């Protein structure tokens, strides 16, 4: 589950969860966005953060997806999430999550009355040092990341590595 961090017009931090998003290419991501306070903030600022929810942050991550900042201005305080300002984009970083991407919108696709697809460049990636592998890169197996399960309306723990991308399939050549 992705947590989208933005600032509103008054500089107040906001967060929402997004289930539909992924890699666009090596340096870009795509997120499917409905009409929310977050989409208003994205239109205003054009920059945001994307954090990865974990088992440990699941309750707060779920909360920010079911409560609108428009209706509850104290949403972030009630979530218990800790916030600092990003050094690279005009958006909040929620330090409770193990890894955060700082992003800048480069394109919106298929805009409609109900939402759009956002394509954003990844400006920087922050990772808590407790979640780094020996090579200094993020180790997602250490993070207890969760994903949204739309079939059973729940959250599932992501698993361990099971193969080598662009390699294991060569056995069938």
Model-identified regions with their sequence ranges:
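Basic, polyanion-binding surface patches
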Residues: 1-173
């Amino acid at each position: 589950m992705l947590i989208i961090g933005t600032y509103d017009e008054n500089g107040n931090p906001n967060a929402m969860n997004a289930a539909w998003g992924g890699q666009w290419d090596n340096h870009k991501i795509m997120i499917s966005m409905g009409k929310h306070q977050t989409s208003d903030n994205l239109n205003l600022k054009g920059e945001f953060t994307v954090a990865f929810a974990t088992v440990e942050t699941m309750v707060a991550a779920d909360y920010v997806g079911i409560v609108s900042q428009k209706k509850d201005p104290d949403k972030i305080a009630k979530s218990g999430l800790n916030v600092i300002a990003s050094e690279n984009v005009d958006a909040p970083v929620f330090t409770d999550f193990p890894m955060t991407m700082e992003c800048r919108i480069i394109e919106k696709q298929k805009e409609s009355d109900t939402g759009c697809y956002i394509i954003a460049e990844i400006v920087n990636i922050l990772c808590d040092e407790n979640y780094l592998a020996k090579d200094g890169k993020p180790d997602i197996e250490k993070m207890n990341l969760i994903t949204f399960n739309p079939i059973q309306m729940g959250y599932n723990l992501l698993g361990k590595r099971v193969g080598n991308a662009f390699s294991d399939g060569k056995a069938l050549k």
